[in-house]
Amino acid sequence: MKNCIAAIPEVKEMVEKAKLKGIETPHTRFPNQFPKCPYGLKGVYCILCANGPCRITEKTPYGVCGATADVIVARNLCRAVAAGTSCYVHCAENAARALLSAGKGEGSYEIRNEKKLKFLAKKLGFDANKDAKQLAVEVAEFILDDMYKPRWEKSELVPKLCPEKRLEVFEKLDILPGGAKGEIVDALTKTSTNLNSNPMDLLVHCLRLGLHAGFTGLLMTCWLNDILFGSPKITVVENGFSSVKPNNVNIMITGHQHALIQPLCEAAMEEDLIKMAKEAGADEIKIIGATCNGQDMETRIAHLPESFVGYIANNFTTEPLVATGLIDAVVSEFNCTFHGLKFVAEKTKTKLICIDDMAYVEGAEYIPWEPENAKEKAREIIKKAIEAFKERKGMQKDYYDEKVKSVVGVGEESLVEFLGGSVKPLIELIASGKIKGVVGVVGCSNLASGGHDNIIVTLTKELIKRDILVLAGGCVNSPLKHAGLFDPASAELAGENLKEVCKSLGIPPVLNFGACLSIARIEQVAVAIAEELGVDIPDLPVAASAPQWLEEQALADATYAVDMGFTVHVSPVPFVTGSELVTKVLTEAVEGLTGGKLIPEPNPYKAADLLEQTIMEKRKKLGI
């Protein structure tokens, strides 16, 4: 591999410099994994028992147990969606624990957004006029209790969060789930050896899991963090790789859980720790936002202390960034925390610290987070980072003088506030044709779809060129940010109509909604538009794209989106094509049930055609 295939030049240079230092990154490991297993790519492999591995071919259409391609593919998919759902539920669980501690007055967490607390309490059926702390305890306990219900007890949380028209669909299909953890455990049970061999039942279970991924996981994590730390506020920032300065104690965070990292940002501003850092030869202590947590925090950067520099790196940029020598410590609390960080850190003498054992990297020091001791643990971590800074003196540090202007902090509330209090102005722009429609470009990045971030940037530019407004959330935001697409000046790249809209409002044609958790916020915008028009989500000229999905959480995201009635473009093609049944259900038949479906398409230009076609068909049906 002569050159690193990456959309952002600085990342490409980081990888090349890492190679010269003898440091491997995902970009250099990826080519070594070819050729890929064709059975794995199609999903027709099974390793569930000692008779395996079994693979399905024309000559051997059954596994030893008799499992068909349909069964094996559906089973693998259900397991993946269950795992992805469990990840999001874990994040919501810890956020609820933080809120519970705030309500009980135990630890350092506070209720900073009583308005959002009362909004959520009312939605869940509580008397919103109660004392805020009492309300916080009741809301947190309700959410946690709902998570822990068995599958045979219906979730109360999901129906209370569902839009009315979607709830009718879910009731008709009988896919309203039981408790989140019960659904996840039973999905693992029924996909074990010689148990469920009904592919349709397994796919229906995916739909139930998707509702928990979206409502219990994504939406609850967003809203609980809003209560604890403030809702996203539209803000203009200027940051980039230049924010990672060689003379600072730089602590990079990886994960999804704002609740676990907020105390770190606050501790980095404490005078005694700043004094300690200066005595070690540093100028300041800075928290470097990476992966989804960095984005989630940047949406609230208006509420955060100056120690947080902003969102700098997505999943596949973390190892190259550590390889620059600029990072003194990495604090992991969830994915995307790449295992290769161990090997990079060994070369750069970077300190690895884990605060949630879900992201326990080999070689990391484990300092467990608990809501009650979060402040003390944060101080301990910063002291270790300062010590690492001292020990790393003389280490080569490759500084990048890159800075971009970005509009951040867009959310379902801040967008409506910007529009004057309702979504009507957006509806009018869509109805007039100034904006053809809206596409949520969301999710991960990968190396398999045209290289690191390439399809994300190409597809997004192609969509805005066609007067389609893009709402972005997830690791996609790193290349979109570094490519300048969150800068209002990028309106010049949009089609004439969208350009005019953006210039008149002073906004970019790509709106940064933050983390992959914010997929729920994008969905809430669609809900608001649908309710204003009195229609259901599948009727709207909106769609979604996961142009470089990577992991099981992305499959849970896609399932949630299909539940909600979105047409969802995905690349690469999921590992399901070995089953004609599963492929047909996901790309065709499910549309007749929920109104949503998947469109697999690896070519970004063809994907843009398909998404535009979807939007134009919806416009035609609405008569606009």
Curated annotation (Swiss-Prot):
Keywords: 4Fe-4S, Iron, Iron-sulfur, Metal-binding, Nickel, Oxidoreductase. GO terms for biological process: generation of precursor metabolites and energy; nitric oxide catabolic process; response to hydrogen peroxide. Its cofactor is [4Fe-4S] cluster; [Ni-4Fe-5S] cluster. Binds 3 [4Fe-4S] clusters per homodimer. [4Fe-4S] cluster 2 binds at C46, C49, C54, C65. The keyword Cell division does not apply. Pfam families: Prismane. Its EC number is 1.2.7.4. It catalyses: CO + 2 oxidized [2Fe-2S]-[ferredoxin] + H2O = 2 reduced [2Fe-2S]-[ferredoxin] + CO2 + 2 H(+). [Ni-4Fe-5S] cluster binds at H256, C292, C336, C444, C475, C516. InterPro entries: CO_DH_a-bundle, CODH, HCP/CODH, Prismane-like_a/b-sand, Prismane-like_sf. [4Fe-4S] cluster 1 binds at C37. The keyword 4Fe-4S applies. It comes from the Archaea. GO terms for molecular function: 4 iron, 4 sulfur cluster binding; anaerobic carbon-monoxide dehydrogenase activity; hydroxylamine reductase activity; nickel cation binding; peroxidase activity. Cluster B is an all-cysteinyl-liganded 4Fe-4S cluster; cluster C is a mixed Ni-Fe-S cluster is to be the active site of CO oxidation. Cluster D is also an all-cysteinyl-liganded 4Fe-4S cluster that bridges the two subunits of the CODH dimer. CODH oxidizes carbon monoxide coupled, via CooF, to the reduction of a hydrogen cation by a hydrogenase (possibly CooH). Belongs to the Ni-containing carbon monoxide dehydrogenase family. Homodimer. This is Carbon monoxide dehydrogenase. It comes from Methanocaldococcus jannaschii (strain ATCC 43067 / DSM 2661 / JAL-1 / JCM 10045 / NBRC 100440) (Methanococcus jannaschii). The lineage of its organism: Archaea, Methanobacteriati, Methanobacteriota, Methanomada group, Methanococci.
